Swiss-Prot record:
Lumenal topology ranges: 24-375
Sequence positions that bind CMP-N-acetyl-beta-neuraminate: 162, 185, 294-296, 316, 329-330
Subcellular compartments: Golgi apparatus membrane; Secreted; Cell membrane
Topology of the protein relative to the lipid bilayer: Single-pass type II membrane protein
Disulfide bond residue pairs: 157-307, 171-371
Gene3D superfamilies named in the record: Glycosyl transferase family 29 (3.90.1480.20)
Gene that produces this protein: ST8SIA2
Entry PTM: Autopolysialylated. Autopolysialylation is not a prerequisite for the polysialylation acitity, but enhances the polysialylation acitity.
Protein name: Alpha-2,8-sialyltransferase 8B
Residue stretches spanning the membrane: 7-23
GO MF: alpha-N-acetylneuraminate alpha-2,8-sialyltransferase activity; nucleotide binding
């Protein structure tokens, strides 16, 4: 009887410890959300990650917590022009890859696979944990059987952001010369080929793009426009974050239905559920106190797994360029954005500061002006 009592006591204590751990994690997540990613985040993150998982790469260049400089002047200036002598730091790139692998594996996390889900399965949305979705037959049919990046490795990769800083850059030819080209949010390329190139190996598509760029497919004209854009991908990977928020459910299903109905030649991928938090965790441990990683930062983090050298274009979260000329938020539309707004889910200038630091150390190359040979 005494042995049985001790067993019950041990089980109760174990449950209590587990409860306290999860309560602590929830409190930290709430604190991060309420503070906008500043102040006490570093100590909070250190309590969640063991010493062996802490990154050693110097990204912010100091031991003090990273805070957004609201003037942005200290962040955006002194980027070397494309013609400056930038040298790839292979040792640092490999170290970053190994550290990121402690948090995620892009080969696996780039997409949920068909063998892990079946039609009717219930999934909790990442940002709306109280809301759920059922895996539809269309979604199931489009899940890849194996990772689209299984055993893939590329010499050079271009990640093309959508900033208006690309306009008049003449970077199109340079971008297309890379082994693997990643683009964001179905950004148009044909009309801007001189500056952004045409080659696409992977393109992301946030569900909100369907609303913003294709008028929620309200009629046949808009459906045809989206269909033409999808057909132009011609075998590329279409990366659709389907499990983020419930607001995107219908839009994801519309796209899935179009792809199946019209036999569009794309390789669909739907990122794993842990991916976003894993990416965020990596950057937080490097004192880059982001709220929610942007698509560009997500793509860079994933690309470290399968790219030897990474080149970034169109990453510029400021309304003026280095010469104080106006810069559009997107190179292809007139959308406005408050880069430093507390209401924004992203901290773009802070992300840029981290990428700029990695550029200076040779881990990646950041191009924010004209490319070599541009006329």
């Amino acid at each position: 009887m005494q042995l049985q009592f001790r067993s019950w006591m041990l089980a109760a204590l174990t449950l209590l410890v587990v409860f306290l751990i999860f309560a602590d994690i929830s409190e930290i997540e709430e604190e991060i959300g309420n503070s906008g990613g500043r102040g006490t985040i570093r100590s909070a993150v250190n309590s969640l990650h063991s010493k062996s998982n802490r990154a050693e790469v110097v990204i912010n260049g100091s031991s003090s917590p990273a805070v957004v400089d609201r003037s942005n002047e200290s962040i955006k200036h002194n980027i070397q022009p494309a013609s400056s002598k930038w040298r790839h730091n292979q040792t640092l790139s490999l170290r970053i890859r190994k550290q990121i692998l402690k948090f995620l594996d892009a080969e696996k996390d780039i997409s949920v696979l068909k063998g892990t889900l079946k039609p009717g399965d219930i999934i909790h949305y990442i940002f709306d944990r109280d809301s759920t979705m059922n895996v539809s037959q269309n979604l199931y049919e489009l899940l890849p059987r194996t990772s689209p990046l299984k055993n893939k490795h590329f010499g050079t990769c271009a990640i093309v952001g959508n900033s208006g800083v690309l306009l008049n850059s003449g970077c199109g030819q340079e971008i297309d010369a890379h082994s693997f080209v990643i683009r964001c949010n179905l950004a148009p390329v044909q009309e801007y080929a001189r500056d952004v190139g045409l080659k696409t190996d992977l393109v992301t598509m946030n569900p909100s793009v369907i609303q913003r760029a294709f008028e929620d497919l309200v009629n046949a004209t808009w459906r045809e426009k989206l269909l033409q854009r999808l057909h132009s991908l011609n075998g590329s990977i279409l990366w659709i974050p389907a499990f983020m928020a419930r607001g995107g459910k219908e839009r994801v299903e519309w796209v899935n239905e179009l792809i199946l109905k019209h036999h569009v030649n794309v390789r669909t991928a739907y990122p794993s559920l842990p991916l976003l938090h894993a990416v965020r965790g990596y950057w937080l441990t490097n004192k880059v106190h982001i709220k929610r990683p942007t698509t560009g930062l997500l793509m860079y983090t994933l690309a470290t797994r399968f790219c030897n050298q990474i080149y970034l274009y169109g990453f510029w979260p400021f309304p003026l360029d280095q010469n104080q000329n106006p810069v559009k938020y997107h190179y292809y539309d007139s959308l406005k954005y408050g880069y430093t707004s507390q209401a924004s889910p992203h901290t773009m200038p802070l992300e840029f500061k981290a990428l700029k630091s990695l550029h200076e150390q040779g881990a990646l190359k950041l191009t924010v002006g004209q490319c070599d040979g541009a006329t």
